[in-house]
Amino acid sequence: MRLVVCLVYLVSFALVCQGQGFKGGYTGSYSRAPPYGSRGPISTHPISRPATGCTSCHTITFDKAACCRLFGRCCSALKG
């Protein structure tokens, strides 16, 4: 049962991720709210992670990096 749930989750993530690659417009990174009780300034810069086969993605989130590894291309927005 857990295997089925896991597979359904992975397939739905892949479909959503694949759909993002063909949509027009770049939505950019999402800023996160600072945790309670934090001390000092918190950086809101997007996480920079190069993914294999995805050299056009310079600053992407963890989800988009996972999508790049899965499909071998940038999933945020295709330019041109």
UniProtKB/Swiss-Prot annotation:
One cellular component term from this protein's GO annotations in UniProt: cytoplasm
Reported modifications of this chain: The N-terminus forms pyrrolidone carboxylic acid.
Signal peptide, first to last residue: 1-19
One example GO MF annotation: chitin binding
A Pfam family annotated for this UniProt entry: Penaeidin
Principal subcellular localization: cytoplasm
Signal in keyword set: yes
One annotated GO biological process: response to bacterium
Designated name of the protein: Penaeidin-3
Protein family: Belongs to the penaeidin family.
Induction section of the entry: Up-regulated in response to V.parahaemolyticys challenge. Highest expression at 6 hours postinjection of the bacterium, then gradually down-regulated upto 48 hours postinjection.
Subcellular location: Cytoplasmic granule
Tissues of expression: Strongly expressed in hemocytes, and to a lesser extent in heart, muscle, gills, intestine and eyestalk. Lowest expression in hepatopancreas.
Function: Antibacterial and antifungal activity. Presents chitin-binding activity.
Positions of post-translational Pyrrolidone carboxylic acid modification: Q20
Disulfide cysteine pairs (residue numbers): C54-C67, C57-C74, C68-C75
Keywords from the UniProt entry: Antibiotic, Antimicrobial, Chitin-binding, Disulfide bond, Fungicide, Pyrrolidone carboxylic acid, Signal
